Amino acid sequence: MKKLFASLALAAAVAPVWAATQTVTLAVPGMTCAACPITVKKALSKVEGVSKVDVGFEKREAVVTFDDTKASVQKLTKATADAGYPSSVKQ
C-alpha cells in the first residue's frame, strides 16, 4: 500500500513536467475588415489554456500560445469556426 501511495505521489509531482506551451500560427482567410481580428481574438482567448493571442489583419493570421494539456489545435480552429471565421494551421 505504501508503494502505491509513493508511486502516485511521484506521478503527481512529475505530471506538470509533461505540460508544454505550444505556439501555433493559424491562417484565417475570412477576415475581411478591420473589426474581424477583434472577434477572432475574443474567440481564441476564451479557449481554456490559451495564454496569448496576436491577430494580424494584414496577413490574415492568428498566432496563439497555449498549454497543450488544456487546449489543442482542434479546439482553437473550432473556436474560430464557431465565431464565423474558419481557420487552419499555417504551414
Curated annotation (Swiss-Prot):
Entry annotated with the keyword Metal-binding: yes
PROSITE patterns per UniProt: HMA_1, HMA_2
The answer to whether keyword Transcription regulation applies is no
Its Gene Ontology cellular component terms are: periplasmic space
The record ties this protein, via CDD domains, to: HMA (cd00371)
Print the keywords alphabetically: Mercuric resistance, Mercury, Metal-binding, Periplasm, Plasmid, Signal, Transposable element
Query: Care to name a GO molecular-function term for this sequence?
Result: mercury ion transmembrane transporter activity
Q: What is its main location?
A: periplasm
HMA domain sequence ranges: 22-88
Q: What span is annotated as the signal peptide, if there is one?
A: 1-19
Location in the cell reads: Periplasm
Question: At which positions is Hg(2+) bound?
Answer: 33, 36
Gene disruption: observed consequences:
Mutation decreases resistance to mercury.
* A family per Pfam: HMA
Chain's role: Involved in mercury resistance. Acts as a mercury scavenger that specifically binds to a mercuric ion in the periplasm and probably passes it to the cytoplasmic mercuric reductase MerA via the mercuric transport protein MerT.
What family is this? Belongs to the MerP family.
Oligomer and partners = Monomer.
Q: What is this protein called?
A: Mercuric transport protein periplasmic component
Source organism (scientific name) = Shigella flexneri
Q: Which gene encodes it?
A: merP
